[in-house]
């Protein structure tokens, strides 16, 4: 089980990203638009740099929904390999069958 503080920190980053995503996208569009004047693009770069780091999508870590484990997660299930195996062996994951050949 991961520390509650690290799980909460990641949730806070997700919230910040959700709130600032539109503004970040607008600024990035201005920065990438070569038809805009250089001064306007530079001003957009400065505004983007002033935004909180935690509002960036790259700061978000995929974590297991049950345990909070940060490594070896399956995106589709939002579970770590350990939690997925445990739930799968109990028959709680639809369509998941134990491999045998």
UniProtKB/Swiss-Prot annotation:
SUPFAM superfamilies to which the protein is assigned, alphabetical: Glucocorticoid receptor-like (DNA-binding domain)
Sequence intervals crossing the membrane: none
UniProt entry keywords in alphabetical sequence: Ribonucleoprotein, Ribosomal protein, RNA-binding, rRNA-binding
One MF annotation (Gene Ontology) recorded for this entry: structural constituent of ribosome
Positions with biased composition (Basic residues): 11-23
Bias-annotated ranges (Basic and acidic residues): 1-10
Gene3D superfamilies, A to Z: 1.10.287.1480
Pfam families in alphabetical order: Ribosomal_S14 (PF00253)
GO biological processes: translation
Source domain of life: Bacteria
Region of interest (Disordered), ranges: 1-23
GO cellular component, one term: small ribosomal subunit
Subunit structure: Part of the 30S ribosomal subunit. Contacts proteins S3 and S10.
PANTHER family per UniProt: 30S RIBOSOMAL PROTEIN S14 (PTHR19836), SMALL RIBOSOMAL SUBUNIT PROTEIN US14M (PTHR19836:SF19)
Functional note: Binds 16S rRNA, required for the assembly of 30S particles and may also be responsible for determining the conformation of the 16S rRNA at the A site.
Family: Belongs to the universal ribosomal protein uS14 family.
Protein name: Small ribosomal subunit protein uS14
């Amino acid at each position: 089980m991961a520390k509650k503080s690290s799980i909460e920190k990641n949730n806070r980053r997700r919230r910040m990203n959700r709130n600032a995503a539109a503004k970040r996208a607008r600024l990035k569009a201005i920065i990438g638009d070569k038809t805009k004047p250089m001064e306007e693009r530079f001003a957009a770069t400065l505004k983007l740099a002033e935004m909180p780091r935690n509002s960036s999508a790259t700061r978000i870590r995929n974590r297991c929904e049950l345990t909070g484990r940060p490594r070896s997660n399956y995106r589709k299930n939002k579970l770590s390999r350990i939690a997925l195996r445990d739930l799968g062996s109990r028959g709680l994951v639809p369509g998941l069958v134990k491999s045998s050949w």
